[in-house]
Regions:
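A conserved acidic beta->alpha catalytic loop
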Residues: 22, 40-48, 89
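Conserved donor NDP-sugar-binding/catalytic core segment of glycosyltransferases
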Residues: 93-121
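Short aromatic/hydrophobic "clamp" motif used to bind/position activated sugar donors
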Residues: 82
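Glycine-rich, basic loop-to-helix element that forms the pyrophosphate-binding segment
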Residues: 61-77
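Acidic donor-binding/catalytic loop of UDP-sugar-dependent glycosyltransferases
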Residues: 46, 85-101, 174
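Cell-envelope/extracellular polymer assembly enzymes that use nucleotide-activated donors
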Residues: 2-4, 35, 171
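Short, well-formed alpha-helical segments that are part of the catalytic scaffolds
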Residues: 12-27
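Acidic donor-binding loop at a coil-to-helix junction in glycosyltransferase catalytic cores
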Residues: 166-172
Length: 245
């Protein structure tokens, strides 16, 4: 079974190299053929060169909408299993082994636990973020940083809904759940805590309250979604290295 790893990226030169090294090292332990596609969304830095230096495929787009970027990667992919991994997310080999076992066991898709790197994050901010991730896991909602689906199920579900500029992974998860079993893996991925460092607690709370009050209309426009779309990046990668990374 060919596995396609799809990595959307916008100005990710700092973190992308370690993400790809770790992902490829983990994928090689599966003894399954795989491809990695970095979907470069009009980056102004060395994202494309970093991806090319890692020996993976690069798809150039100019979309500025994460659902559309992921869908573009899916259309370009050749695999029977589509795996969406954010450019700031490290995927351990045990997580990929769990994913493969779930799919071979009949799951149409799934996700994993999500942990933040936690470096330089205020303790209570990290606690709230981890609580949110735990609640999503308990509710079987996969984070967009790591989500997998059989191609047949992904296409039957309509892919990521491009009416939305955020929360698109939740809508896809609900659609996949109507087609079969959605597996939440006990293993985890490690994603960057940069948003917890680059945004104040007040900014994060205001963003969450805005979404809670306005609901779906709030995520149908890019305006007001600075938490996801303002493009802030850190100068160094502080994520702890994993095996192969």
């Amino acid at each position: 079974m060919l596995i396609s790893f799809i990595v959307p990226a916008y100005n990710e030169e700092v973190m992308l190299g370690a993400t790809l090294r770790t992902l490829c090292a983990s994928a090689r332990t599966l003894a399954e053929p795989f491809e990695v596609i970095v979907v470069n969304d009009a980056s102004s830095d060395a994202t494309a060169r970093t991806a090319q230096a890692s020996g993976v495929s690069v798809l150039e787009v100019d979309l500025h909408q994460i659902s559309a970027v992921r869908n573009a990667g899916a259309r370009s992919a050749k695999g029977e299993l589509l795996v969406f991994v954010d450019a700031d997310t490290l995927v351990p080999e045990e997580t990929l082994r769990g994913m493969l076992a779930a799919v071979q066991g009949g799951a149409v898709g799934g996700g994993a636990r999500v942990h933040f790197d936690g470096h330089g994050v205020r303790a209570w901010t990290r606690w709230l973020a981890e609580l949110g991730c735990w609640m999503m896991y308990r509710l079987s909602v996969a984070g967009g940083c790591f989500l997998f689906a059989r191609r047949t199920a992904f296409e039957a579900a309509g892919g990521f809904d491009e009416r939305y500029f955020a929360s698109e992974e939740i809508h896809l998860r609900l659609a996949l759940g109507k087609l079969g079993r959605f597996a939440m893996l006990p293993a985890a991925v490690i994603t960057s805590g940069r948003k917890l460092r680059l945004f104040s607690a007040g900014q994060i709370l205001r963003q969450m309250l805005r979404l809670a009050v306005r609901g779906l209309p709030a995520v149908r426009r890019r305006d007001g979604l600075d938490f996801w779309y303002n493009g802030r990046r850190e100068a160094t990668d502080v994520r702890p290295p994993l095996k192969g990374g």
